[in-house]
């Protein structure tokens, strides 16, 4: 993590998630790396109901959350029931299905069979309460600093 404060924040989410009933599939926690100073956290995997802070908020740490769903439609609906929308990954051997799902997810970024891939010039950014909006690292970024104004006066 970038700081002790962020490490404590991530560990707090793990604790709150468990207190709210999340099943621990892979236990995370603070990690010490011999000979390396830093604020390390072991990856964690939690599972259960989406009615859980660890599933509902952006943790910005090595934490994943699994929630079961019956079919594609329910999975999309569940994924979109959030106040956030920074990014998602869709993983499937059926690329057509993965593309169909990714196009229906409300987020600034959707990746298929990968994560955190940013080719140059591709806009990224979040929606809803995530990030600063779309368009970072692209021509769309300029629109964040641009105020369009038309002034019309008689001659």
How would you describe each model-predicted region?
Residues 7, 21-22, 60, 73:
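Low-complexity, intrinsically disordered short peptide segments enriched in small/polar/basic residues
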Residues 20-21, 37:
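Generic structural motif recognizing short loop/turn segments at the entrances and edges of beta-strands
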Residues 21-31:
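Short secondary-structure junctions
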Residues 14:
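Conformationally flexible catalytic loops at phosphate/diphosphate-handling active centers
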Residues 33, 37-155:
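Conserved C-terminal structural/oligomerization subdomain of aldehyde/semialdehyde dehydrogenase
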Residues 1-11:
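Short beta-strand to alpha-helix junction loop
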């Amino acid at each position: 993590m970038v700081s002790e404060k962020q490490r404590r924040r991530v560990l707090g989410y793990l604790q709150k998630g468990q207190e709210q009933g999340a099943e621990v599939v892979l236990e995370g926690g603070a990690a010490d790396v011999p000979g390396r100073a830093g604020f390390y956290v072991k990856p964690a995997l939690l599972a259960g109901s989406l009615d859980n802070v660890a599933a509902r908020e952006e943790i910005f740490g090595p934490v994943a959350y699994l929630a079961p769903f019956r079919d594609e439609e329910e999975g999309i609906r569940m994924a979109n029931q959030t106040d956030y929308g920074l990014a998602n990954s869709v993983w499937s051997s059926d690329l057509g299905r993965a593309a169909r799902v990714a196009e229906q997810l409300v987020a600034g970024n959707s990746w298929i069979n990968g994560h955190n891939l940013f080719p140059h010039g591709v806009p990224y950014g979040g929606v809803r309460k995530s990030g600063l909006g779309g368009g970072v690292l692209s021509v769309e970024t300029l629109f964040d600093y641009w105020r369009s104004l038309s002034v019309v006066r008689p001659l």
